[in-house]
Swiss-Prot record:
Pathway: Cell wall biogenesis; peptidoglycan biosynthesis
Name under which the protein is recorded: Biosynthetic peptidoglycan transglycosylase
HAMAP family per record: PGT_MtgA
Location within or outside the cell: Cell inner membrane
Length: 229
């Protein structure tokens, strides 16, 4: 019985590892394809309870202050980290251990991985997968592609995905023509896109817009130049 049990366990591990290897290889192939091809949809779009509006736009066609506004608001270390901000994660885990719940500590790369391939919610399993996918995106795509995809798939309202759809919905024009203030107002929607509007900002959100514009000035117009060229 012991020999049979060991044989069964060995066979189980063999099948499991083969399955995981196939999954990893398929994922790498998918990421390689999406490095060059706009994602036709995302897991978040597929799970949306609202009609989806999304229009792809190349990051090269956007004004430089639009990606800067998002980076200033969401992840100022984006050009410097490799997909994961360990300082923010450590702080979030300490808060979790203190009973404050699992708070967001996601980089733009992690948010891209989540929006593209995972599901809503905050738990350690999903956060772990999110972190692993983020490292994969950094290795396969690079910063420019990650930021381009994020700007095109991030949710900005109920069923509104990407800066182009958001700009058309809220400002009746292409994202190519957004002003600095309009870009900052879109950026403040990202943490809670379904409950915020750039036209109905609370005092707190007005403060966040002003803070975002100040951060953009401090970072400088050339802050993302090295990753966008």
């Amino acid at each position: 019985m012991t020999v049979r049990r060991r044989g069964f366990m060995a066979w189980t591990w063999f099948i499991t590892w083969r399955f995981l290897l196939v999954v990893v290889l398929l994922l790498l192939v998918l990421l390689l394809v999406l490095r060059f091809v706009p994602p036709p949809t995302t897991s978040f779009m597929l799970q949306s309870a609202y009609p989806v509006s999304q229009h792809w736009v190349s990051i090269d066609e956007l004004p430089s202050h639009l990606p800067l506004a998002v980076v200033a608001s969401e992840d100022q270390l984006f050009p410097k980290h490799f997909g994961i901000d360990f300082t923010s994660i450590t702080k979030a885990l300490n808060q979790y251990d203190d009973g404050q719940g699992l708070r967001g500590a996601s980089t733009i790369t992690q948010q891209t991985a989540k929006n593209l391939l995972l599901w809503p919610g905050r738990n350690l399993v999903r956060k772990g997968l999110e972190a692993m996918l983020a490292v994969s995106l950094e290795a396969v795509w690079g910063k420019k592609r990650i930021l381009e995809v994020y700007l095109n798939v991030a949710e900005f309202g109920k069923g509104i995905y990407g800066v182009e759809a958001a700009s058309r919905h809220y400002f009746n024009k292409s994202a190519r023509y957004l002003s600095i203030n309009e870009a900052a107002r879109l950026a403040v929607l990202l943490p809670s896109p379904r409950s915020r509007s750039p036209h109905h900002l609370t005092p707190y959100l007005h403060q966040r817009v002003a803070w975002g514009e100040k951060q953009m000035r401090q970072l400088g117009s050339g802050y993302l130049k090295t990753i966008l060229n």
